[in-house]
């Protein structure tokens, strides 16, 4: 199944999978259905390039959702961030509409997009950066990890 996912080319500026393709990755779909904070945390860690851990991002999502029911709004912010990083067409209104109509579909679409771009979502940012470095930096479609400030 994973080989098929990576083999599908997608148009520049477009999502690699459709909004309603949740069941193309049944495992992630079930995880997201039962506990969306896990999928959100995995996505946020990659999008934030490791500045926030999966656990911290997932816990914050869950806390925001439990206290204010605005977890979807928080996830919306990450859709925009991800679109900007990968030059995917869209706008904030569409992101919000997707998350408010079907948060499950929106989160799984983000997860699949990162997976299609070469990320192993179970490794997190640091694991993927190390994997890329060990493979000579050519296997992943992710931006290279930037170190601290230099002169």
Curated annotation (Swiss-Prot):
Keyword Amino-acid biosynthesis (UniProt): no
Lineage, top ranks: Eukaryota, Viridiplantae, Streptophyta, Embryophyta, Tracheophyta
Membrane association type: Multi-pass membrane protein
Assembly and oligomerization: Homopentamer.
InterPro entries, A to Z: PLAC_motif_containing (IPR006461)
Pfam families associated with the record: PLAC8
Protein name: Protein PLANT CADMIUM RESISTANCE 1
Upregulation: Up-regulated in shoots by cadmium.
Keyword Transmembrane attached: yes
Location(s), subcellular: Cell membrane
Comment block on domains: the N-terminal domain (1-84) is required for cadmium resistance.
Keywords: Cell membrane, Membrane, Transmembrane, Transmembrane helix
Residue stretches spanning the membrane: 31-47, 54-71
One MF annotation (Gene Ontology) recorded for this entry: mRNA binding
Effect of residue 35 to A: No effect on cadmium resistance. Decreased cadmium resistance in a heterologous system. Total loss of cadmium resistance in a heterologous system
Phenotypic consequence of residue 29 to A: No effect on cadmium resistance. Total loss of cadmium resistance in a heterologous system
Tissue specificity annotation: Expressed in aerial part, but not in roots. Detected in the guard and mesophyll cells.
Family membership noted in the UniProt record: Belongs to the cornifelin family.
């Amino acid at each position: 199944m994973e080989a098929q996912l990576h083999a599908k080319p997608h148009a520049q500026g477009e999502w690699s999978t459709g909004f309603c393709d949740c069941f193309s990755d049944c495992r992630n779909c079930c995880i997201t259905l039962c506990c969306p904070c896990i999928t959100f945390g995995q996505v946020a860690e990659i999008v934030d390039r490791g500045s926030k851990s999966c656990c911290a991002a997932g816990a914050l999502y869950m806390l925001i959702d439990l206290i204010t029911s605005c977890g979807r709004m928080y996830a919306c912010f990450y859709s925009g961030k991800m679109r900007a990083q990968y030059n995917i067409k869209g706008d904030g209104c569409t992101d919000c509409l997707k998350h408010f109509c079907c948060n499950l579909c929106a989160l799984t679409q983000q997860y699949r997009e990162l997976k299609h771009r070469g990320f192993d979502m179970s490794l997190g940012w640091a694991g993927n950066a190390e994997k890329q470095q060990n493979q000579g930096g050519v296997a992943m479609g992710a931006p290279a990890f930037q170190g601290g400030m230099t002169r």
